[in-house]
A protein has these predicted regions:
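Short, well-ordered coil/turn segments that N-cap beta-strands
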Residues: 1-3, 80-82, 116-118, 189
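Hydrophobic faces of well-ordered beta-strands that scaffold small-molecule active sites
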Residues: 5-8, 84-86, 120-122, 191-193
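Acidic (Asp/Glu)-rich catalytic clusters
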Residues: 2, 76-77, 184
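Active-site groove signature of glycoside hydrolases
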Residues: 58, 67-97
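Short, solvent-exposed turn/loop segments enriched in Gly/Ser/Thr/Pro and often Arg
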Residues: 9-15, 86-92, 124-127
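Short, flexible/disordered intra-domain loops and linkers
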Residues: 17-22, 93-101
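Glycan-recognition surfaces
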Residues: 14-54, 58-62, 66, 70, ...
Length: 195
């Protein structure tokens, strides 16, 4: 059956305490009123509380897009990965510093030109992303499924329960109910085994 390798990259999250944060700090997002926008709803260390050190980054700003693109390029070249996963790819904020949508489009386009056989996958989506990201996790638009699935495919979210105890691994949701009858699958979604 085989397997494919797809590392995850934080599309719009950066640790303000990281040693090289200053290289791309200008890409930290502010709300339209100027207040700092933190990506503080994610729990990375499984303590059931947000972290407090994540800046919400803007891919429209060259410094962040180039830094993230370099990290993805390094993983592709060093490990020969089959795909790369852009966590929270559908995140968008009306940030006057730069156009977030244009930034993600440029990142994906640059990587596709350099590595045409490496698949881009995103989490979350909005209609304009369907033009250049063909695969997503976390499908939730059931009323318009037939329309959306003409342009992209979807697989189960990272929080999809693993067989047995229903663990979601390191994801902040902890455990979910595993249904042995249906394998916790939904119609139209690529079957996904999370371990």
């Amino acid at each position: 059956m085989g397997f494919r390798v797809m590392p995850m990259f934080g599309t719009n999250s950066a640790n303000r305490n990281a040693p090289d944060y200053a290289r791309f700090a200008d890409a930290a997002t502010a709300k339209i009123d100027g207040d700092r926008l933190d990506l503080n709803w994610v729990d990375w260390d499984n303590d059931r509380h947000q972290e407090g050190w994540l800046s919400y980054m803007n891919l429209g700003v060259d410094s962040w897009r180039e830094w993230l693109g370099g990290r993805i390029t390094d993983a592709i070249q060093r490990y020969g990965v089959d795909a790369y996963f852009l966590d929270i790819a559908g995140g968008w904020v009306n940030n006057p510093r730069a156009d977030m949508h244009e930034g993600i489009r440029r990142l994906v386009g640059d990587l596709r030109r350099a590595y045409p056989r490496v698949l881009c996958c995103g989490e979350m989506h909005y209609d304009a992303l369907l033009a250049f990201i063909p695969l997503y996790q976390a499908f939730s638009q059931w009323p318009v499924r037939d329309h959306v699935q003409r342009y992209a495919r979807f697989f189960q979210h990272l929080s999809h329960p693993a067989p047995g105890r229903g663990s979601s691994g390191v994801h902040e949701s902890g455990f979910n109910h595993w249904d042995a009858q249906t394998l916790s699958l939904r119609a139209g979604i690529i079957p996904t085994l999370n371990v």
